[in-house]
Amino acid sequence: MEAWECLEDFSAVRNLLEQSSNSTSWFWRFLWGSSQAKLVCRIKEDYKWEFEELLKSCGELFDSLNLGHQALFQEKVIKTLDFSTPGRAAAAVAFLSFIKDKWSEETHLSGGYLLDFLAMHLWRAVVRHKNRLLLLSSVRPAIIPTEEQQQQQEEARRRRQEQSPWNPRAGLDPRE
């Protein structure tokens, strides 16, 4: 996912969504847009019909968003985004860019609010995915040593203490 490490920075996510939305002209995107924004636009155009079908399955998503309710958006959209591969991450960004374009046609809310709202949720989903991966990679199964292994470890510890030139009990009362 090295190609999409920019998704870990909120301002980069916001810029990517802004550059890949229909509010940015293709000419500006062609001259100054990032390669990722161009890729997201291409994915958005290629999968337009699939994205339309996904939005139809979400029911009254835009009505609830216009009223300020986020629960449906969280359940139906954000929790289903997949960032396991660079291609899936690009598709997730393209889907949110598609949602921004459709939502801006049907709302009274400002474009800046839409952009901030979607960028914040996308960024949080990426960070949550990364933290989940880090947590899973750090969890190791507990290895319970057998009695024989415990005895071997204890003997090895005693030998190291005896061979050590530094004696932590030096100057103390002798052992009984």
Curated annotation (Swiss-Prot):
It is found in: Host cell membrane; Host nucleus envelope; Host nucleus lamina. One of its GO terms (cellular component) is host cell nuclear lamina. One of its GO terms (biological process) is symbiont-mediated suppression of host apoptosis. Residues 146-176 are annotated as: Disordered. Changing residue 87 to A: No interaction with BAX and loss of anti-apoptotic activity. It holds the Pfam family Adeno_E1B_19K. InterPro entries: Adenovir_t-Ag_E1B_19kDa, Bcl2-like. It comes from the Viruses. PROSITE patterns: BCL2_FAMILY (PS50062). Keywords: Apoptosis, Early protein, Host cell membrane, Host membrane, Host nucleus, Host-virus interaction, Inhibition of host apoptosis by viral BCL2-like protein, Membrane, Modulation of host cell apoptosis by virus. Belongs to the adenoviridae E1B 19 kDa protein family. Putative adenovirus Bcl-2 homolog that inhibits apoptosis induced by TNF or FAS pathways, as well as p53-mediated apoptosis. Without E1B 19K function, virus production is compromised because of premature death of host cell. Interacts with Bax protein in cell lysates. This is E1B protein, small T-antigen.
